[in-house]
């Protein structure tokens, strides 16, 4: 019987070997992708639990199937913990992803064809903030705002002027590659000035907001969305918050039955566990380490003339570096660093001149290395190794030395033991 197949190594060696290789890769690679993190064993255990068997269309107390008393309790805990973390009156923990959370938020706030302002992708925005290849750009009339070409920071006077010209029904704040504090109160003022709603996508900074290290958008936004991974250090998934009861009803309807069927209750349970971790005082210590590491790394790059840190620094968990004085483009840098077991991603920079498949920059994030235990000393070392590798792209002896030093760091800070 299939129920006897407890040992998936014996039952499906191909998958087991692939997972083992990924475990090995994560153990011996330095992870700097800003949207990735390292979850606890408790989060993984909840996500791998028997809850994966249960279908539960609807919401706690209002399900379409029977046998949901237990999952009602679990989802209720996730909701209450999310509300406590962010000081919100209402929370929907069912979105399968941040993109689906954003989709539901749009459905609750606007109609197809409505004009929306969102951050330009090359300035740091996200695909779901109006990119033409995304459902957002195909369903709504998005007009992009950017950053100041000199400072590479948000220019609220320019955004206000643009909003007065285009008269959006909705303004979307938040980013996936913007390294400074976002003043949500100013976005609220702009939205009010033109009679628009305000939605904030805080997917990248949610953990910093939860720790009190970045201003919260929840008091200002009509709807706030986020992922539950990234700096929140939970399972991959989405979350929607609001203080408006009528919007909460629209959000719930947009998620189910609007764009999703049954929630992934095993993931909801993992979200609940992660939220409990966030409520622990130790999480703020972790979040502060994220910031300290990012600022230390950015400073290393700022001290090298061949590298340019976009907007001259960082106030959150990430920063961008223009690498075109050292290597051809960001893709080349990403691939080269992959070869020395440092993982990050190519990234467009403001007013980008290269294609998104090449880019002028790379994006560096510190959430995963902070979770692993790296402090400022190790983070500075990682930045130096990146520079060393990129400046010696054709020197195999130097690259071998970098690989060896990466291995020393990863061996000193192991991820997990005995998972596979």
Swiss-Prot record:
(6S)-5,6,7,8-tetrahydrofolate binds at residues 121, 125-127, 246, 355-357. It is an enzyme of class 2 (transferase). GO terms for molecular function: glycine hydroxymethyltransferase activity; pyridoxal phosphate binding. The keyword Amino-acid biosynthesis applies. One of its GO terms (cellular component) is cytosol. The record marks 229 as: Plays an important role in substrate specificity. Gene3D superfamilies: Aspartate Aminotransferase, domain 1, Type I PLP-dependent aspartate aminotransferase-like (Major domain). It catalyses: (6R)-5,10-methylene-5,6,7,8-tetrahydrofolate + glycine + H2O = (6S)-5,6,7,8-tetrahydrofolate + L-serine. The keyword Transferase applies. It is found in: Cytoplasm. GO terms for biological process: glycine biosynthetic process from serine; tetrahydrofolate interconversion. Its EC number is 2.1.2.1. Pathway: One-carbon metabolism; tetrahydrofolate interconversion; Amino-acid biosynthesis; glycine biosynthesis; glycine from L-serine: step 1/1. InterPro entries: PyrdxlP-dep_Trfase (IPR015424), PyrdxlP-dep_Trfase_major (IPR015421), PyrdxlP-dep_Trfase_small (IPR015422), Ser_HO-MeTrfase (IPR001085), Ser_HO-MeTrfase-like (IPR049943), Ser_HO-MeTrfase_PLP_BS (IPR019798), SHMT-like_dom (IPR039429). The modification N6-(pyridoxal phosphate)lysine is found at residue 230. Catalyzes the reversible interconversion of serine and glycine with tetrahydrofolate (THF) serving as the one-carbon carrier. This reaction serves as the major source of one-carbon groups required for the biosynthesis of purines, thymidylate, methionine, and other important biomolecules. Also exhibits THF-independent aldolase activity toward beta-hydroxyamino acids, producing glycine and aldehydes, via a retro-aldol mechanism. Belongs to the SHMT family. This is Serine hydroxymethyltransferase. It comes from Streptococcus sanguinis (strain SK36). The lineage of its organism: Bacteria, Bacillati, Bacillota, Bacilli, Lactobacillales.
């Amino acid at each position: 019987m299939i129920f006897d197949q407890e040992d998936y190594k014996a039952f499906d060696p191909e998958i087991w070997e692939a997972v083992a290789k990924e475990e090995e890769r994560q153990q011996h690679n330095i992870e700097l992708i800003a949207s990735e993190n390292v979850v606890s064993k408790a989060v993984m255990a909840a996500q791998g639990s028997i809850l994966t068997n249960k279908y539960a269309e609807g919401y706690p107390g209002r399900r379409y199937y029977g046998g949901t008393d237990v999952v009602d309790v679990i989802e209720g805990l996730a909701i209450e913990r999310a509300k406590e973390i962010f000081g919100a009156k209402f929370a929907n923990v069912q979105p399968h992803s941040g993109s689906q959370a954003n989709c539901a938020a749009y459905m609750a706030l606007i109609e197809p064809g409505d004009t929306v302002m969102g951050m330009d992708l090359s300035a740091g925005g996200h695909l779901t903030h109006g990119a033409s290849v995304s459902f957002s750009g195909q369903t709504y009339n998005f007009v992009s705002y950017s950053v100041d070409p000199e400072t590479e920071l948000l220019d609220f006077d320019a955004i206000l002027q643009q909003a007065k010209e285009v008269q959006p029904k909705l303004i979307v704040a938040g980013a996936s590659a913007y390294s400074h504090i976002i003043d949500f109160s100013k976005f609220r003022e702009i939205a009010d000035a033109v009679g628009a709603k305000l939605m904030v996508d805080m997917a990248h900074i949610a953990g910093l907001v939860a720790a009190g290290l970045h201003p919260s958008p929840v008091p200002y936004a009509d709807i706030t969305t986020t992922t539950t991974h990234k700096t929140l250090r939970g399972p991959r998934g989405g979350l929607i918050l609001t203080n408006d009861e009528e919007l909460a009803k629209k959000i719930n309807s947009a998620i189910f039955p609007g764009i999703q069927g049954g929630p992934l209750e095993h993931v909801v349970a993992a979200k609940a566990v992660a939220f409990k971790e966030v409520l622990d005082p130790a999480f703020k210590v972790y979040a502060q380490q994220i910031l300290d590491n990012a600022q230390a790394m950015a400073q290393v790059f700022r001290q090298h003339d061949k590298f340019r840190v976009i907007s001259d620094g960082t106030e959150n968990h990430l920063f961008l570096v223009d690498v075109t004085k050292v290597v051809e483009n960001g893709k080349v840098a990403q691939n080269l660093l992959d070869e020395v077991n440092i993982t990050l991603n190519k990234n467009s920079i403001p007013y980008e001149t290269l294609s998104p498949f090449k880019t002028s920059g790379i994006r560096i994030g510190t959430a995963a290395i902070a979770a692993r235990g790296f402090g400022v000393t190790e983070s500075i070392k990682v930045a130096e190794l990146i520079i060393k590798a990129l400046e010696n792209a054709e020197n195999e002896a130097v690259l071998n030395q970098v690989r060896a030093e990466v291995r020393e760091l990863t061996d000193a800070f192991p991820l997990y033991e005995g998972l596979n």
